[in-house]
From Swiss-Prot:
GO terms for cellular component: plasma membrane. It comes from Psychrobacter arcticus (strain DSM 17307 / VKM B-2377 / 273-4). This is UPF0060 membrane protein Psyc_0916. The chain crosses the membrane at residues 7-27, 33-53, 63-83, 87-107. The keyword Amino-acid biosynthesis does not apply. It is found in: Cell inner membrane. Belongs to the UPF0060 family. SUPFAM superfamilies: Multidrug resistance efflux transporter EmrE. Keywords: Cell inner membrane, Cell membrane, Membrane, Transmembrane, Transmembrane helix. It is a multi-pass membrane protein. The keyword Calcium does not apply. Pfam families: UPF0060. Its main location: membrane. PANTHER family: UPF0060 MEMBRANE PROTEIN YNFA (PTHR36116:SF1).
């Protein structure tokens, strides 16, 4: 799988996980409709399925995915919560993405 496809799949996977956690949060903490649990559960099912599509060992996938998840969560903070990320949020996201790239794309024999 190409690097671009891998990162794109990580981003979609992170979006599914974040949405799957955010929707129950809205019900529990903000008094929104209990019906949000249905799309939340479906989103988490999609998240698990998407993780299974990654072409490398599960442990490596989970470790690298964390870097993309961090960046997607900061993007969610900005676009959904309306909170502008700080410089340190952005720096941390970039560091996490560099870590993801090293884990996923470094040459290896196995």
């Amino acid at each position: 799988m190409s690097e671009l496809k891998t990162v794109g799949l990580f981003a979609i996977t992170a979006l599914a996980e974040i949405a799957g956690c955010y929707l129950p949060y809205l019900w529990l903490r903000e008094g929104k409709s209990i019906w949000l649990l249905i799309p939340g559960a479906l989103s988490l099912v999609a998240f698990v399925w998407l993780l299974s599509l990654h072409p490398t060992a599960a442990g490596r996938t989970y470790a690298a995915y964390g870097g993309v998840y961090i960046s997607m969560a900061i993007l969610w903070l900005w676009t959904v919560n309306g909170i502008r990320p700080t410089t340190w949020d952005i720096v941390g996201s970039v560091v996490a993405l560099i870590g993801m790239a090293i884990i996923m794309f470094a040459p290896r024999s196995v």
